[in-house]
UniProtKB/Swiss-Prot annotation:
Its EC number is 1.2.1.8. SUPFAM superfamilies: ALDH-like (SSF53720). The keyword Ribonucleoprotein does not apply. Binds 2 potassium ions per subunit. The active site is at K162 (charge relay system), E252 (proton acceptor), C286 (nucleophile), E464 (charge relay system). The keyword Lipid metabolism does not apply. Dimer of dimers. This is Betaine aldehyde dehydrogenase. The gene is betB. K(+) 1 binds at S26, I27, D93, V180. The record marks E248 as: Seems to be a necessary countercharge to the potassium cations. It holds the Pfam family Aldedh. Keywords: Metal-binding, NAD, NADP, Oxidation, Oxidoreductase, Potassium. The modification Cysteine sulfenic acid (-SOH) is found at C286.
């Protein structure tokens, strides 16, 4: 029997039954428990949500900027009041340690919503003089009904990253969470309604990306789709969105990011950064720096420091405050990660630690994989080329700066990159050469609300967060006014 009651769709300000009887299970990856039965939206439900969103958006957009800002700030307050409750639910649904979800997931999502709530009154046009008798003014108008499609690793944070700028700009949103982790997004919908967001402005449709996601991206009255997920799926979403009605798209896709340790680096700091860039959230972070480049002369010393730090990982029941390493998000994903680890062994990478499923005691019922470190890796290995999205670090040796920059850029991805060095001249020089949209110097992973994030190459289109993202949820209307005589050629 499921722990929670049947989870319904959220349309037009409240829970409604799907138009069919199909459901799917939400599974706790720490122990295989069925958390809830969740209704699967139909194509008819997508249309219902669009109609509700169109109605609600007109009311929302007609409010003053200050009114919208106040309502969104109230949603921020409710999120913070319910932080621990939401974090506990996120931990059950994703398997992420409560020590993460309590202090990061809801907190950073609320920070982004607060940031955009403060920017609402700053949405403004401009006045452009043409001559004494004529000028142009511009209006930034909301797109209308937009859609967000989330990934499974940061469910509520991603829903907030997408909905915050969309709602701040006066749009209504239809959001489809990942089928794997749907529960906290439904709670977010409740919070928006409680805060005073008009009915229909934020709707949640649960179900598979193959069905519900496709119906959303193909819908002719949805003006924009913001998607977070894998590159292959992103390409399909983009093709569907453009072929149906030339929708605008924002894509935050996969990565295989390089972390470069230079010969002057503080190796203890470098090892700390590498650990966070590979094993935080059990390695399930799109920006992870999984290709760790280390000077050949320092590789042995660096490996020893990594092994020392791996001993500090505390895997186990993610509801335990002392645990800092939970299971992977699902048993299916666990098998995928184990498959990549097997390829690493087969292709000649030297295994420093891990490399297996964790078993015994609490681990037997969960999707746990040991923190895994390979070294002596080469650029053509599968574990170096493809995104694994799990706790697998690949250490690669190098000799020169030119060599490591070339190899770091030798990838189809371009989401993130980082370097560790004491030489700031080198730091900025190399960062300017790296083909990645998010870069860190002597750090890794922080993405403040003010910081635009997104990728180069096949890692994405557009940006999330920052002022630029707010503009992407508006369109410009140009208006010319003539105060003087109008001359006709006829």
């Amino acid at each position: 029997m499921a722990r929670f009651e049947l989870q319904k769709l959220y349309i037009d300000g409240g829970y409604v039954d799907a138009s069919n009887t199909e459901t799917f299970d939400s599974i706790n990856p720490a122990n295989g428990e069925v958390l809830a039965k969740i209704q699967r939206a139909s194509k008819e439900d997508v249309e219902r949500a669009v109609v509700a969103a169109e109605k609600g958006q007109k009311i929302w957009a007609a409010m003053t900027a200050v009114e919208r800002s106040r309502i969104l700030r109230r949603a921020v307050d409710i999120l913070r009041e319910r932080n621990d409750e939401l974090a506990a639910l996120e931990t059950l649904d994703t398997g992420k340690a409560i020590s993460e979800t309590r202090y990061v997931d809801i907190v950073t999502g609320a920070d982004v919503l607060e940031y955009y709530a403060g920017l609402v009154p700053a949405i403004e046009g401009e006045q452009i003089p043409l001559r004494d008798s004529s000028f142009v003014y511009t209006r930034r108008e909301p797109l209308g009904v937009v859609a967000g499609i989330g990934a499974w690793n940061y469910p509520i944070q991603i829903a907030l990253w997408k909905s915050a700028p969309a709602l701040a700009a006066g749009n209504a949103m239809i959001f489809k969470p990942s089928e794997v982790t749907s529960l906290t997004t439904l709670k977010l919908a409740e919070i928006y309604t409680e805060a005073g967001v008009p009915n229909g402005v934020f709707n949640v449709l649960t179900g598979s990306g193959r069905e519900v996601g496709t119906w959303i991206t193909e819908h002719p009255r949805i003006e924009k789709v913001s998607f977070t997920g894998g590159t292959d799926t992103g390409k399909k979403v983009m093709a569907s969105a453009s072929s149906s009605s030339l929708k605008e798209v924002t894509m935050e896709l996969g990565g295989k990011s390089p972390l470069i340790v230079f010969d002057d680096a503080d190796l203890d700091r470098a090892a700390d950064i590498a650990m966070m860039a590979n094993f935080y959230s059990s390695g399930q972070v799109c920006t992870n720096g999984t290709r760790v480049f280390v000077p050949n002369a320092l590789k042995g010393e660096f490996e020893a420091k990594i092994l020392e730090r791996v001993k500090r990982i505390r895997p186990g029941n993610p509801e335990d405050e002392n645990i800092n390493f939970g299971p992977l998000v699902s048993f299916e994903h666990m098998e995928s990660v184990l498959g990549y680890i097997a390829k690493g062994k087969e292709q000649g990478a030297r295994l420093l630690c891990g490399g297996d499923r964790l078993t015994g005691g609490v681990f037997d019922k969960g999707a746990f994989v040991a923190a895994t470190v390979f070294t002596d890796c080469t650029d053509e290995m599968t574990i170096v080329r493809e995104e694994i999205f799990g706790p697998v670090m690949s250490i690669l040796g190098y000799d020169t700066e030119d060599e490591v920059v070339r190899r770091a850029n030798d990838t189809d991805f371009g989401l993130a990159a980082g370097i560790v060095t004491r030489d700031l001249n080198r730091a900025h020089r190399v960062i300017h050469l790296l083909e990645a949209g998010i870069c860190w110097i002597n750090a890794w992973g922080e993405s403040a609300a003010q910081m635009p994030v997104g990728g180069y190459k096949q890692s994405g289109v557009g940006r999330e967060n920052g002022i630029s993202s707010l503009a992407q949820y508006t369109r410009i209307k140009s208006v010319q006014i003539e105060l003087g005589d109008y001359a006709s050629v006829f």
